[in-house]
Swiss-Prot record:
Record-level GO BP terms: carbohydrate metabolic process; pentose-phosphate shunt
Listed GO CC annotations: cytoplasm
Similarity comment text for this entry: Belongs to the transaldolase family. Type 3B subfamily.
GO molecular function: aldehyde-lyase activity; transaldolase activity
Name of this protein: Probable transaldolase
Subcellular location: Cytoplasm
UniProt gene name: tal
Amino acid sequence: MKFFIDTANFEEIKEAHAWGILSGVTTNPSLVAKEENVSFHDRLREIAELVDGSVSGEVIALDAEGMIKEGLELAAIAPNITVKLPMTPAGLEACRFFANKGIKTNVTLIFSANQALMAARAGATYVSPFIGRLDDIGQNGVELIETIADMFTIHNIDTQIIAASVRHPQHVTAAALAGAHISTTPFKVLKQLFHHPLTEKGIEGFLADWNKRKGE
């Protein structure tokens, strides 16, 4: 499973990129709205120049014509921009348009296997099931990942599954085991993946032994 980072904060992206683990970035209107003094297109351009992999930029229009117009503008920013579309009839209409043009798409706000299958058949490059939000309403988000992965395998579907709405490190592990191709993970959760008390205790022990030896 690959790691994407789910943020529009350029400093967070730069730090995670330096770790050598990032394969892409996802953004959405809510994340971009938190960033000040930079336009949406300029921020996507900055990210796309730094990160070689897919950079998802989401449309805001609700009609297919508007989505297509916005998506073409986003795709023109850089060759690694992926147009992010909502799971609606208009979103799938736009998805098919972009698929026919060879433009990558990420269909977001997936909450059922049927939605994922429809998006895949509309030509989506990626589908993004929201596991945390499903957990919030008492459903099993990771189980949905597994169902979609099984369905795609049975029917030889190439669309990749992005585990989204990732809340904690356990979501990352579970998504990987369930068959997600990618986890798009907030910066806070990515940093949490580093930590284990035995790792930190081991580092402290090595340093203590080394400093003791130096003092002899």
